């Protein structure tokens, strides 16, 4: 039925224009609201000013320095993976970092992105370490992760640390490692508060795979870093 009211047509055009120009901003606002509701529903949980304090608390109160299989996605200069290797000193722990070391694979949006293509590049240089428990796998996740998993057998509790920043990278990683996750596996997100990237990827993955979690703690401004333990 035709719209005989010019005022209605004008309002529709204005609304379409606003959504078209500011759709990403509106989606970010909606994502922030979803994140806020989720965090509120999962309280109480311990909060720490710095992420390394969160890591230390997890190892001391949950892992008790028992051996772990630690997989990190998005290594950059190695601060997190090397910190975890220093915190968890068990000789049987394994620490494996995945990164292209070429920076971000694509330029994300200007509202919730992190920089242009190539941001966080180390120009191919991997972090230096003398710890034999630590190794790095160089390349894009969609080229390296499946071949790695074909031969990988978890020996200890899994700790998955994600600092890949982008929605696509985070969702690909979570979906791909899902077969090796189980109750007790720990997931850590370094940029969880980003509503259109790590948070959205985690939410979509959890809905699709029907997983539930308990909060182990958070750190940083507005829960930038979050740690969870898988229940099912």
What are these regions (language model features)?
Residues 2-82, 86:
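Class I SAM-dependent methyltransferase Rossmann-like catalytic core
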Residues 35-42, 60-232:
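S-adenosylmethionine/decaboxylated-SAM
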């Amino acid at each position: 039925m035709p719209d005989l009211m010019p005022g209605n047509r004008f309002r529709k055009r204005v609304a379409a224009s606003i959504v078209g120009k500011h759709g990403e901003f509106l989606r970010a606002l909606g994502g922030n609201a979803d994140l806020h509701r989720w965090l509120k529903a999962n309280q109480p949980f311990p909060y720490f000013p710095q992420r390394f304090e969160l890591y230390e608390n997890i190892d001391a109160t949950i892992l008790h320095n028992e051996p772990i299989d630690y997989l990190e996605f998005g290594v950059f200069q190695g601060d997190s993976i090397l910190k975890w290797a220093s915190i968890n000193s068990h000789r049987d722990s394994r620490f494996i970092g995945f990164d292209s070391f070429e920076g971000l694979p694509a330029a994300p949006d200007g509202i919730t992105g992190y920089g242009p293509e190539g941001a966080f590049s180390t120009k191919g240089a991997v972090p230096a370490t003398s710890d034999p428990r630590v190794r790095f796998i160089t390349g894009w996740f969609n080229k390296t992760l499946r071949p790695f998993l074909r031969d990988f057998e978890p020996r200890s509790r899994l700790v998955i640390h994600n600092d890949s920043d982008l929605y696509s990278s985070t969702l690909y990683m979570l979906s791909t490692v899902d077969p090796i996750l189980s109750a007790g596996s720990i997931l850590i997100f370094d940029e969880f508060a980003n509503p259109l990237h790590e948070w959205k990827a985690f939410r979509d993955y959890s809905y699709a795979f029907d997983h539930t979690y308990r909060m182990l703690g958070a750190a940083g401004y507005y829960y930038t870093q979050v740690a969870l333990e898988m229940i099912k």
